[in-house]
Amino acid sequence: ECDNENMIENLYKAVDARDLPCMADVESSMLYFCSKVVKYNKVTLTGECADEIFGGYPWFHKEECFKAEIFPWSMDMQPRKMLLNDDIIQKVDLESYARTAYQKTINETPKLYGEDQIEARRRQISYLNLRWFMVTLMDRMDRTSMHCGLEARVPFADHRIVEYLYNVPWELKCLNGVVKGLLRAAGEGILPDEVLYRRKSPYPKTYDPNYEKILSKELLKVMAKKGAP
C-alpha cells in the first residue's frame, strides 16, 4: 500500500533518482510503484505523452487555462515561491522568467495556414506541451523507473505518431466531443469499454492533510541541520 509514510520514505529516493528537487508525492509514489512492478517484469509500457498529443489535459478544455498567456500548468507561481527568501525572489523574478520562456516558445510555434484563432491557440498549447511538460514527465518516468532497474518504454512518444497527430484536426482528436476520443475509438474492440471510456485519473497524489504535516516535520529536520543544502 502506498500510504503517507511510504511516500515520505520514497521522497528522498525520488530526489536522488531525479538528482534535483522533484514533484514530491507524485514522484515518490511513482518510484514506489516502479519498485513493485520490477519484481514481476523488467520491461513495461507506459502511457506518457498520450495526453500531450491527444489533448487530454484540462488546459486544452478549460477556458481559463486555454486563454492564459502563461504556461497553463503554472498559472500561479506563489506556491513555488513560498520556500524562497525575498532576496532570491527579487534576484530570480520567476514570473518574468516564465513569461519570457513562454513567449519565446509561442513565437517559435509552427503555424498552419488557414487555421482560425482557436485552432491556432490549440496548436500553441500542443507545442508548449511537447517542448516543456512532456519533457518533464518523460524525464521523471525515465529516472524513477531506471532507479528501480525497470525499463519503461513510451510508445506514445514515438516521433512518428507525435508528428502525425500534431496536424490532426481537433474535432478528430476530441471525436464525438469525448476527451481523447480518437485514442479511445482506436482501442474499440481491443479494450473493454469500462477501460476505454473511464474518466481520466491523474497519477496518484495525496490530498491527505496528514501527508502535509509529516512532510513539514521532515522539512524542519532538514532546515535544522546547518550543513544541509
Region annotations inferred by a language model:
Residues T44-T46, L128, M134, E163, ...:
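Short hydrophobic-aromatic micro-motifs
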Residues F71-P72, F133, P202:
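Generic structural signal for residues positioned in beta-strands
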Residues F133-M138, E151, A228-P229:
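A short, ordered amphipathic alpha-helix with a cationic face
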Residues L191-P229:
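PAPS-dependent sulfotransferase catalytic core
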